[in-house]
């Protein structure tokens, strides 16, 4: 099984969730073993997608350094992971990725337009060898060894609309596109004013965010799935784990997880060299793992 990049360059435009300004995005092919690289054209600054370059996880996953930052990368990263893309350059002319419709389906469409190209180098994956867990009170995220990678996610909100939701996701590109990619980000009406006073969520609207009041959803079209909230958290988690640089072959379990806990989990994994093995998918090894790329 070979590493993948894009077959051609594709461009798009969307609104930034936090600043509310139009953002141009370009996805470009990269050579083998390059990984996922973000480039801010307005700063002439590159940022490799990796846990060590994460500087903030409060409202989104943010890459950066003293030169600047790129926020809200997780939806795009999630789509890139689902499509099995190993090497891609993401060019942005602003400090965040566009929110599109609040899900990752627009990025999936961009990747469909670009197509994929095989590179003459074996694909590598990260196989989890022992359990790694991060907790914050009763909240936790965990990776464990498995023969059938899944994501088991539970959320619990003190809100009548959301309440407690669980979803078990078995990884495949087809399953992702059908059941995860269209799940939108969500927020609470009571938080909007506070966020905007901090110059955040300025681009948020009913066109790119599910807005929840105490006992109703404000979006006139309603939900795309009855459990769209937990499905979106899975979308986010896939994007956050992609920062490890490989498709992760392990069971991910979360209760009330977050970008912050996901980031701490990726750091814990990389700290313990016995916790994982990087497996090159040569002809002799790919059979055991190829299902996850179906």
From Swiss-Prot:
First-tier enzyme category under EC: hydrolase
EC numbers, comma separated: 3.5.1.108
UniProt keyword annotation of Zinc present: yes
Xref: InterPro entries: Ribosomal_Su5_D2-typ_SF, UDP-acyl_GlcNac_deAcase, UDP-acyl_GlcNac_deAcase_C, UDP-acyl_N-AcGlcN_deAcase_N
Record-annotated membrane-spanning stretches: none
GO molecular function: metal ion binding; UDP-3-O-acyl-N-acetylglucosamine deacetylase activity
Alphabetic keyword roster: Hydrolase, Lipid A biosynthesis, Lipid biosynthesis, Lipid metabolism, Metal-binding, Zinc
One GO BP annotation of this record: lipid A biosynthetic process
One Pfam family matching this protein: LpxC
Coiled coil stretches, renumbered: none
Gene3D superfamilies to which the protein is assigned, alphabetical: lpxc deacetylase, domain 1, lpxc deacetylase, domain 2
Pathway: Glycolipid biosynthesis; lipid IV(A) biosynthesis; lipid IV(A) from (3R)-3-hydroxytetradecanoyl-[acyl-carrier-protein] and UDP-N-acetyl-alpha-D-glucosamine: step 2/6
Binding site for Zn(2+): 75, 232, 236
Catalytic residues (positions): 259
A GO-annotated cellular component: membrane
Catalytic activity: a UDP-3-O-[(3R)-3-hydroxyacyl]-N-acetyl-alpha-D-glucosamine + H2O = a UDP-3-O-[(3R)-3-hydroxyacyl]-alpha-D-glucosamine + acetate
Origin superkingdom: Bacteria
Cofactor(s) of this protein: Zn(2+)
Function: Catalyzes the hydrolysis of UDP-3-O-myristoyl-N-acetylglucosamine to form UDP-3-O-myristoylglucosamine and acetate, the committed step in lipid A biosynthesis.
UniProt similarity note: Belongs to the LpxC family.
Record protein name field: UDP-3-O-acyl-N-acetylglucosamine deacetylase
Taxonomic lineage from the root: Bacteria, Pseudomonadati, Campylobacterota, Epsilonproteobacteria, Campylobacterales
């Amino acid at each position: 099984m070979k590493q993948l990049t894009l077959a051609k360059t594709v461009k798009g435009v969307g609104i930034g969730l936090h600043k509310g300004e139009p953002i141009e995005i370009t996805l470009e092919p990269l050579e083998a073993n390059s990984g996922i690289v973000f480039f801010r054209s307005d700063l002439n600054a590159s940022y490799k997608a990796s846990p060590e370059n994460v500087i903030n996880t409060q409202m989104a996953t943010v890459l950066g350094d003293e030169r600047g930052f790129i926020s809200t990368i997780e939806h795009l990263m999630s789509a890139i992971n689902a499509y099995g893309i190993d090497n891609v350059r993401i060019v942005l002319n602003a400090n965040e990725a566009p929110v599109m419709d609040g899900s990752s389906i627009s990025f999936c469409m961009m990747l469909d337009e670009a197509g994929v190209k095989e590179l003459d180098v074996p694909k590598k994956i990260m196989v989890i060898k022992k359990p790694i867990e991060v907790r914050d009170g009763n909240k936790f995220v965990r990776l464990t060894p498995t023969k059938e990678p899944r994501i088991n996610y539970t959320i619990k909100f003190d809100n009548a609309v959301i309440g407690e939701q669980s979803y078990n996701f078995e990884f495949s590109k087809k399953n992702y596109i059908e059941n995860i990619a269209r799940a939108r980000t969500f927020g609470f009406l009571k938080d909007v004013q506070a966020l905007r006073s901090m110059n955040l969520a300025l681009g948020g609207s009913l066109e790119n965010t599910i807005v929840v009041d105490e006992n109703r959803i404000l979006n006139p079209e309603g939900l795309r799935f009855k459990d769209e909230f937990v499905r979106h958290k899975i979308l986010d988690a896939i994007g956050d784990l992609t920062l490890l640089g490989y498709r992760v072959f392990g069971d991910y379990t979360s209760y009330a997880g977050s970008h912050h806990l996901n980031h701490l989990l990726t750091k814990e994994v990389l700290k313990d060299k016995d916790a994982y093995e990087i497996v090159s998918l040569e002809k002799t090894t790919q059979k055991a793992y190829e299902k996850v790329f179906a």
